[in-house]
């Protein structure tokens, strides 16, 4: 939409812990190749040279990830283990997917011979931002579409209150209207539970199953 206005409201970082993910490298490379790490939809390619050991491969992955400042993670490595740490604290870091060789052999993405890498969840992110300031900043400005990047109960309920039919944006007194959109990843049962919990007429929760 080249004509629609877009407003973005920054919110304070939540108190809590930042999510982490680990990539554990085993085996020395017996050929030259590339490690393809996907952080969300972004592919990061780390070069591997024949003869590289686990420490060298992990360092290459670390450097490749840190070379992309727009990624939601920063990387560190030690003794063949790469640790990705979310740039921001909070529950939202738990849903950032990290995978290897998404397109597989057919897409030309395979680990170099001799190398194995295991991806695992590390420390779970905790905490959610306080959105009362953001809601106050919206004041009585009408918005057709409101994007909510957080899907925790407290954040969604803050918007539920703002959008309600009695005193919120859909009330007779305010008549601002609009609709909120957010998303969640999880197992099928987790998404069903979330859908039941957030069954609100003015909020759409898009659910995506984890790979």
Predicted features and spans:
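A glycine- and small-residue-enriched flexible loop/hinge signal that marks low-structured segments
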Residues: 1-2, 63, 138-211
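Extended, beta-strand-rich, solvent-exposed assembly scaffolds of outer structural proteins
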Residues: 1-2, 24-99, 146, 161-166
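A broadly used, surface-exposed interaction patch
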Residues: 2-15, 118-123
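Catalytic cores of large soluble enzymes that bind and process phosphate-bearing ligands
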Residues: 49, 53, 123-126, 151
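Short, charged beta->alpha transition segments
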Residues: 7-11, 20-26, 125-138
């Amino acid at each position: 939409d080249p004509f629609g206005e877009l407003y973005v409201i920054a919110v304070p970082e939540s108190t809590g812990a930042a999510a982490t993910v680990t990539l554990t490298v085993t085996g020395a490379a017996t050929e030259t190749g590339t490690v393809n790490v996907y952080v969300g939809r972004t592919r990061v390619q780390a070069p591997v040279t024949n003869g590289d050991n686990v420490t060298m491969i992990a360092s290459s992955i670390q450097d490749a990830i840190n070379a992309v400042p727009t990624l939601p993670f920063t990387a560190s490595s030690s003794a063949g283990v790469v640790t990705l740490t979310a740039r921001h604290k909070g529950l939202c870091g738990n849903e950032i997917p990290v995978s290897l060789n998404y397109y597989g052999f057919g897409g030309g993405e395979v680990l170099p011979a001799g190398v194995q890498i295991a991806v695992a969840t590390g420390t779970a992110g905790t905490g959610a931002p306080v959105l009362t300031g953001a809601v106050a900043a919206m004041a009585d400005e009408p918005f057709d579409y409101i994007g909510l990047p957080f899907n925790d109960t407290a954040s969604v309920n803050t918007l539920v209150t703002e959008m309600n039919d009695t005193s919120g944006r859909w009330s007779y007194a305010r008549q601002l209207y609009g609709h909120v959109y957010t998303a969640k990843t999880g197992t099928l049962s987790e998404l069903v539970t979330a859908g039941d919990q957030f069954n609100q007429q003015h909020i759409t929760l898009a659910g995506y199953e984890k790979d």
